[in-house]
Amino acid sequence: MDITCIINDTLAVSESFTFDGTNLGFIKLVDIRTGRTLDSARSYSVVNVLREGNNMSINIMNVPDYESDGRTLALCYEYTGRMDFYDISGGRLELKKSVGDKRTVEQLRETDFWKMEKGFYYISMTSSPDCIMVLRTEFETTPLPRYKYTTLSSSLLTYDWNGVPQKEYKLDKTVNNALFDPHSGKLFCFNDELDFEQVYVYGL
């Protein structure tokens, strides 16, 4: 069982994928104590399988990040920014709201995310008791053979736990990781392209 998000002492989220031609992704609500899957739902991850003879290569993109307050499970997909909000209070995945990109998995498969020269990447997710924070970075790339990924700007998108968009904060630094500390009420950010040279602290 591949646990990707621990919700509380009894619940966790895991992911699974099929590679049999259907090539689908699933999120699962799991009872930690027994390992039993309580409920599952299709995800919007893109699973690509390439077979050459007896060899098989697998590429999984647009995977979600997770945050939960114990009652709601929020997902944000890395390349599309789609936000899904599930009510998990009854031990099931009850979708209560989706925000943003509405493309189907089949439509997303037509997008070559690796060849995007410029766009937005929803790279990090954190939360407080009052809101969910998504770090969105604007990026550009230079093509091979001298491939380079550069972060151009960073902003913080906030939502309440019901899925209602709140404020957008434009950060004065380019960062690609964020973590909210509930004890201090501060947001700690850094850019690993700079090899952890600086940590930037924001008050919200």
Predicted feature descriptions by range:
Residues F17-D20, N54-N55, L73-C76, F113-K115, ...:
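Short consensus segments that form the blades of beta-propeller domains
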Residues S14-F19, V134-T151, L194-Y202:
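Short, conserved, GDST-rich strand-edge loop motifs in beta-rich repeat architectures
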Residues L24-G35, Y147-V164, V201-L204:
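Beta-propeller blade signature
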Residues M1-G25, S43-V49:
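Asp-box/WD-like beta-propeller blade repeats and closely related beta-sheet repeat scaffolds
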Residues D2-T10, N55-R71, C76, E117-S128, ...:
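Structural signature of eukaryotic scaffold interfaces centered on beta-propeller domains
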Residues K115-Y159:
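Loop/turn-rich, solvent-exposed surfaces of beta-rich toroidal or solenoidal domains
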Residues L179-L204:
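Blade-level signature of beta-propeller repeat domains, shared across WD40, Kelch, NHL, RCC1
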Residues M1, G35-N59, G91-E117, D172-K173:
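Surface-exposed loop and turn segments in beta-propeller and other repeat-based domains
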